């Protein structure tokens, strides 16, 4: 599958699992915040995998992060593509420098 087929498959999976179903009731319905917390959980797993230099776990965590972001985008009536394009359009104009292994933007 190409990327866009995978994105669509993830959206369909989320629909099938009821993640995007707003009629799950207040205690069971997924919300943008609960999905954001799931993303944070997966990012933590990525950090653990990187710290352990575990390539398979890095791949798994990055994939899981993408899944949570695709679902979040769907919840927000956005596409990951438009979010990425928006961010790219901002960063291409950004100036800054590398500090301690990270790019730090100028104010």
Describe the role of every protein-language-model region.
Residues 1-62, 66-107:
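Flexible "arm" and connector segments at domain edges
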